[in-house]
Amino acid sequence: MHNDKDLSTWQTFRRLWPTIAPFKAGLIVAGIALILNAASDTFMLSLLKPLLDDGFGKTDRSVLLWMPLVVIGLMILRGITSYISSYCISWVSGKVVMTMRRRLFGHMMGMPVAFFDKQSTGTLLSRITYDSEQVASSSSGALITVVREGASIIGLFIMMFYYSWQLSIILVVLAPIVSIAIRVVSKRFRSISKNMQNTMGQVTTSAEQMLKGHKEVLIFGGQEVETKRFDKVSNKMRLQGMKMVSASSISDPIIQLIASLALAFVLYAASFPSVMDSLTAGTITVVFSSMIALMRPLKSLTNVNAQFQRGMAACQTLFAILDSEQEKDEGKRVIDRATGDLEFRNVTFTYPGREVPALRNINLKIPAGKTVALVGRSGSGKSTIASLITRFYDIDEGHILMDGHDLREYTLASLRNQVALVSQNVHLFNDTVANNIAYARTEEYSREQIEEAARMAYAMDFINKMDNGLDTIIGENGVLLSGGQRQRIAIARALLRDSPILILDEATSALDTESERAIQAALDELQKNRTSLVIAHRLSTIEQADEIVVVEDGIIVERGTHSELLAQHGVYAQLHKMQFGQ
């Protein structure tokens, strides 16, 4: 992810504006309603002059007759405009949140695997949920305050200047002083807000780890460790919030003090005979009341800066993700079905952020329809080889060919359509069994095809025992299934996909011996006429492979058939002896 660029608030908002612009009709309606709302308040104050000078001054008693009707009308107008503005702003805010979340979700789906290796799931979830909400809610709340309070200030100033420009001119001095005060605290607000976004990600990550690993926490007695971890990040979040409150609380009294000094000076100036001669009781009441009324919008405008800076800080974290480079998909070649010839030529690969290569000078040919097994100790590079075929990572040196063409010549969609993957880490979705088997292509397959795939994977036995059979919801990541059942659903998914290239990465590791024997027949059938790359820990499952390749520290050290490798008395023979106790 790129570093958060310290963009100015204006630059950040300009970049956000194209997301808001399609919904500007709602903003315009809300703006008009807010201005009318502020105007009704200002006009209400202006009624004090005729009420005092004419009504209670007994020069025009009719004022007391029409005044109640005007007040009722103004309150009705105020209520209507308040509803319209709130509704329109909420509508725009909801649309912006939805748009930002969709952009983030779509962009993240196009990110390379290396991106997710470096980012915690909790932080990314926080970006999609919390930060995107902050952008819209803070910005919309700030907009309401700026328009309504800004209109109030302008209206009050106009009215004050109309009734007594001599007294009102004093308040003009306030503007630059208030502006300086707001600018001073702006940077502080934005800095704290950025820290709050990051801390919220840590809170989400800590909670997510506990929820996902709840069984491990219980079995290993990790309650105290997880509690301390969560207490630490939640307290950090609290401290950041207190810093924000502190900065906001300091700015409020400063602005109010400046305004009160100006107000005191106005009262003093009003006592001058030259000024008093031109003032009536109604006029001085209107001007003085307007000055007091200015306190609220001035305070709100000071607070809105913190709110707006919080939204812009969240916006910058989202733009940092949106600026991250997605998977390179520069290939043009599109095929319906590959023959399945695979070849690694002098391939070297290093994981991003590491210095030592995970694979070095790998040369490997897998003819179409043949089965090649990769064996070796944990961390030797077996799964890395498999992940390069699907271009989850791009190699540093060399070439990987499919049907004689470099993998980078194919579009990613076309390439990955040729590969079915069953790994030891099966991910299932909170959906029906049938939809998990036919994942992403439910419309392409008939019910009979889905059932046949499940039957071939020896999954129908336990599926039929479920309340709703294939239509049973299996919970998040198949929480309602055993490890072996989840694995068989994944194998059924691969059987249904019917791709020419098959990768089995410890595909039977979660199965008991009896289930493994049962499903091995289905896997043998699945591997017929397909290019198969089998990564196995149990050597008994790969003895019939056309070729067995032994990987050690990222290098191919042995290759041959099962019997040939045993005869060499090398690494494979040692692994075989360790497993079978010979």
Curated annotation (Swiss-Prot):
Gene Ontology cellular-component annotations: plasma membrane
Catalytic activity annotation: ATP + H2O + lipid A-core oligosaccharideSide 1 = ADP + phosphate + lipid A-core oligosaccharideSide 2
SMART domains: AAA (SM00382)
Chain ranges passing through the membrane: 16-36, 64-84, 153-173, 253-273, 275-295
Residues binding ATP, per UniProt: 376-383
One GO biological process term: transmembrane transport
Free-text comment on this protein's domains from its UniProt entry: In MsbA the ATP-binding domain (NBD) and the transmembrane domain (TMD) are fused.
Record-stated family: Belongs to the ABC transporter superfamily. Lipid exporter (TC 3.A.1.106) family.
Described purpose of this protein according to its UniProt entry: Involved in lipopolysaccharide (LPS) biosynthesis. Translocates lipid A-core from the inner to the outer leaflet of the inner membrane. Transmembrane domains (TMD) form a pore in the inner membrane and the ATP-binding domain (NBD) is responsible for energy generation.
Assembly and interaction partners: Homodimer.
UniProt name for this protein: ATP-dependent lipid A-core flippase
Organism of derivation: Salmonella typhimurium (strain LT2 / SGSC1412 / ATCC 700720)
Gene, per the UniProt record: msbA
